[in-house]
Amino acid sequence: MTGTILRFYVHENRTHRHVALFEWLLEQAKKLGIHGGSAFRAIAGFGRHGILHEEHFFELTADTAIEVEFVVTDEEAEKLLSLLRQERVSIFYARVPAEFGIVEGDL
């Protein structure tokens, strides 16, 4: 099957409608019928402003990046991007063509 890997990059402390943005993204994708998504926390990184963000042991609020990733059909990708535009969410994303499937085997 062919489709899209859709990745969003957000700061961990960013919210939308009083919910962490990465959690809101996962919930909205689920409501759209997308079959799965994952959120990954970065150890360290920098963005377009060149500021290094990294997690420290004693921080109460982290400012590191969260990557939210979906492997979807092109139609599902468009639905999710359209929703973000309607909600006026400003967010960086990467859209990569993908081939995906399931390898069946003995369990």
Task: Describe the predicted segments one by one.
Residues 1-107:
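Positively charged, small/polar-rich N-terminal and surface patches that mediate targeting and assembly
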